[in-house]
Amino acid sequence: MPKPDIHPTWYPDAKVICNGEVVMTTGSTQPEINVDVWSGNHPFFTGTQKILDTEGRVDRFMRKYGMGSVDNATSEKKSATDETSKES
């Protein structure tokens, strides 16, 4: 037999909330569960693609340490190889 009064309170109709809107109910130990993404707005399930506003780690590293962006570094390498090929 399980010990009495040691288990958390069970809420059989806990509300799952996404962007201020109740999207579903489920059983949980919390009365409300706030989520950022669920199957109704996830790009995989909706078939849409969102463009995120985050920059890549390499770009951030290059900018942080004063090396310019990745595009600048590759274009500098190309121009250097073009100049050496023109000299010969």
Curated annotation (Swiss-Prot):
Annotated region (Disordered), positions in chain: 67-88
Protein name as it appears in the record: Large ribosomal subunit protein bL31
Gene name of the record: rpmE
Keywords tagged on the record: Ribonucleoprotein, Ribosomal protein, RNA-binding, rRNA-binding
Organism: Synechococcus sp. (strain CC9311)
InterPro entries: Ribosomal_bL28/bL31-like_sf, Ribosomal_bL31, Ribosomal_bL31_A, Ribosomal_bL31_sf
One CC-aspect GO term: ribonucleoprotein complex
Molecular-function GO term, any one: structural constituent of ribosome
Pfam families to which the protein is assigned, alphabetical: Ribosomal_L31 (PF01197)
